[in-house]
Swiss-Prot record:
Pfam family name, one: peroxidase
Active-site residues annotated for this sequence: 38, 178
Residue numbers spanned by region Disordered: 286-330
UniProt site (Transition state stabilizer): 34
GO molecular function: heme binding; metal ion binding; peroxidase activity
Cofactor remark from the record: Binds 1 heme b (iron(II)-protoporphyrin IX) group per subunit.
Keyword set, alphabetical order: Heme, Iron, Metal-binding, Oxidoreductase, Peroxidase
SUPFAM superfamilies: Heme-dependent peroxidases (SSF48113)
Record protein name field: Putative heme-binding peroxidase
EC top class, as a word: oxidoreductase
Protein EC: 1.11.1.-
The species this protein was found in: Mycosarcoma maydis (Corn smut fungus)
Length: 330
């Protein structure tokens, strides 16, 4: 066991678990980034609930959310580290692992602060349905990310995390990698999004786009893009950022480092010593419905058609109002 606060020792052990020959593309890195992302991406600025504090995925209500399918692998990879360094909280370990993995895979150095606490029970968990649904369009992206406090530029920058990893049909329903080198952080995601001729995938699964990788043989695995990825180049306000990041790797790395650091601080309330206070976090009270789920039919509700989330946005407005009214009485 390391000394209390010896984060260098924790980082060293995180680096040691990244190589996983039997796992996706031989690396645990991408799934650790996804764990940090999903642990943080439940934040709602309107109700001031959710976020990276608490490590709620330890409980079924959050860990069993279909949007978090497959993240049990990331948690299993990190469990020996938690056992060895028992003083670190899960909330800190999960976010630190994402930051360490990004840099180890060639990405930028990202600011990370310790001090998050773990929930003692599941009473403060955010509702399901707050994470992005890859089958949607630009309106859904804004609905989800604006709720957390992100603008269009930050949405496009955070989408660059799709430089890493792959989709699995038994988890998200989608299948395939976004880029040629899914364990190397780069701006290739944006370049391929603009360069390749993306076509609807012919299969029985949810609607997604596929294209032949540059230099690939006909029988090689195809690259893929989600409807939310393709929406970035269809939307007139988001596309310029895709073009900028495709052209300027350094600009992307710089912006990604800033926005990922912002993401993993969402919902963290620190006292003067820097320790996050779980007792300052608010409980969500009220109903929250998720956006439409995946559809195999292009253009159908749930397949990425603009405007589809508007009715659900109105429902959530009412839910937010109810939640704020309840919180005002606390």
């Amino acid at each position: 066991m390391s000394k209390l606060g010896d984060y260098a020792a924790v980082k060293k052990d995180i680096l040691a678990v990244l190589k996983q020959p039997e796992y996706d593309d031989g690396s645990a890195g991408p799934v650790l980034v996804r764990l940090a992302w999903h642990a943080s991406g439940t934040y709602c600025a309107r109700t001031d609930t959710g976020g990276s504090n608490g490590a709620g995925m330890r409980y079924e209500a959050e860990g069993g959310d279909p949007a978090n399918a497959g993240l049990q692998h990331a948690r299993v990879f990190l469990e020996p580290i938690k056992e060895k360094h028992s003083w670190i909280t899960y909330a800190d370990l999960w976010t630190l692992a994402g930051v360490v993995a990004i840099e180890a895979m060639g990405g930028p150095s990202i600011q990370w602060k310790p001090g998050r606490t773990d929930f003692a029970d599941d009473s403060r968990l955010p509702p399901r349905g707050r994470l992005p649904d890859g089958a949607q369009g630009a309106d859904h992206l804004r609905f989800i990310f604006n709720r957390m406090g992100f603008n269009d530029q930050e949405i496009v920058a955070l989408s660059g995390a799709h430089n890493l990893g792959r989709c699995h049909s038994d988890r998200s329903g989608f299948e395939g990698p976004w880029v040629n080198s899914p364990t190397r952080f780069s701006n290739q995601y944006y370049k391929l999004l603009l360069k390749l001729k993306w076509q609807p995938k012919k299969w029985d699964g949810p609607f997604q786009y596929v294209a032949k990788a540059p230099g690939a043989d006909d029988d090689d695995e195809q690259l893929m893009m989600l409807p939310t990825d393709y929406a970035l180049i269809q939307d007139e306000k988001m596309r310029p950022w895709v073009e900028k990041y495709a052209e300027d790797r350094d600009a992307f790395f710089n912006d990604f480092a800033k926005v990922f650091a912002k993401l993993i601080e969402l919902g963290v309330y620190r006292d003067e010593s820097g320790i996050a206070r779980a007792d300052k976090m608010k409980q969500f009270k009220g109903e929250y419905k998720s956006a439409p789920q995946k559809s195999p039919v292009p253009g159908a509700p749930g397949a990425g058609k603009d405007g589809e989330a508007n009715p659900l946005a109105r429902q959530n407005e009412r839910a937010h109002g109810q939640a704020q009214h309840a919180l005002a009485k606390l």
